[in-house]
Design a protein with these regions (language model features):
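ATP-binding pocket architecture of kinase catalytic cores
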Residues: 19-140, 144-166, 171-173
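Juxta-kinase regulatory segment immediately upstream of eukaryotic protein kinase catalytic domains
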Residues: 1-13
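Catalytic-loop of the protein kinase fold
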Residues: 178-180, 185
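Conserved protein kinase catalytic-loop anchor
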Residues: 176-178, 196
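Conserved N-terminal boundary motif of the eukaryotic protein kinase catalytic domain
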Residues: 13-19
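Active-site activation/catalytic loop segments of kinase-like enzymes and analogous catalytic loops
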Residues: 213-249, 261-279
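Activation of the activation-loop gatekeeper triad in protein kinase-fold domains
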Residues: 199-204
Length: 305
């Protein structure tokens, strides 16, 4: 039975065509209509194992766990565990724009309001009781991204070894929370200045809240992305975003986590550039990355000097 037939049978309604959803989604992601309702369907690609980013059942579980919380997420409508597994969720209205990286016509004032609202949504996320999973601490995060960095050719990561030595002085962990893993405006849908849904839960985990926070702050300043970023006047500073997130309670050791996020971004970009140059994923835009990779490593090192 085709995926479309399985979805229609589970919903008990005839559906329209499964149309691929544009954007950088893992697995197979479609939109479809059933009557007046629109849905998003995520499925494991045929022949692939439901692990990592393709473990869509794990994504469905966390969306269901967050239903009714102060974190806006699409409602899960149906889940089918039969291989290849899939689930259907509500189509969340809104737009997801990364102000300093995406081409857009968003007013700077609205971009700033959205960043402050996202900081509050992140705080709400970290106040949700985490699922009963083994937490990944700061040391585990460092180990994971160190492996990725070491897979990048040395000439693409100048200064990385010095940075990794500095990062080896790992701070103690805060109590574990639910971590989104890629929390930024590009993964939060907005209607005006109101967050309508946090999406793309492929790499959620239980861990230190500062992992999410450091990553989110990275996208507040175009200067972090030489040759890629665009100035957006009036965006909140990192200090203003931290205040929106933490209120009166200071978050310790953020300097280390801001450096970790830069190392992580450099490792991801270096990995993508290597794949392009090896012919594994043709994308000429990857050739724009070296200045940002170098800047990420340099500024991370400066943070820990």
């Amino acid at each position: 039975m085709s995926l479309a037939a399985r979805v229609a049978a589970r919903l008990g309604l005839p559906i329209g065509e499964l149309e691929p959803l544009p954007g950088g989604h893992s697995g197979l992601t479609y939109t479809t209509k059933a009557g007046v309702h629109q849905y998003v369907v995520k499925a494991v690609p045929p022949g692939q194992k439901p692990v990592g980013r393709n473990d869509i059942l794990r994504q469905a579980r966390i969306l269901r766990a967050l239903a009714g919380s102060r974190v806006p997420v699409p409602g899960v409508i149906a889940v089918d565990e039969q291989a290849p597994a899939w689930f259907a969720m509500e189509f969340a209205e809104g737009e997801a724009i990364e102000p300093v990286l995406d081409a857009h016509t968003l007013a700077p004032e609205l971009a700033g309001s959205r960043m402050l609202e996202a900081a509050r949504v992140l705080r709400n996320l970290h106040e949700v009781a985490p699922p009963p999973e083994a937490p990944i601490g700061a040391a585990g995060e460092l180990e994971r991204w160190t492996r990725t960095m070491h897979a990048v050719p040395a000439e693409l990561r100048p200064g990385a070894e010095d940075l990794l030595k500095r990062l080896a002085d790992v701070p103690g962990d805060l109590p574990p929370v639910l971590v989104h893993g890629d929390f930024r405006l590009g993964n939060v849908l907005f209607a005006g200045d109101r967050a309508s849904a946090v999406v793309d839960w492929e790499i959620w985990s239980v861990g230190d809240p500062r992992v999410d926070l450091g990553w989110f702050l990275l996208f507040a300043d175009h200067r972090n992305f030489p040759a890629l970023g665009t100035p957006v006047p009036g965006l909140p500073t990192e200090s203003e975003l931290l205040h929106a997130y933490q209120g009166k309670h200071a978050v310790p050791e953020m300097r280390w986590f801001r450096a970790l996020s830069r190392m992580k971004m450099a490792a991801i970009m270096g990995h993508n550039l290597r794949r392009h140059r090896e012919g594994k994923h043709h994308d000429p835009d990857q050739e724009r990355l070296p200045p940002t990779i170098a800047a990420m490593i340099r500024t991370a090192t400066d943070l820990l000097a």
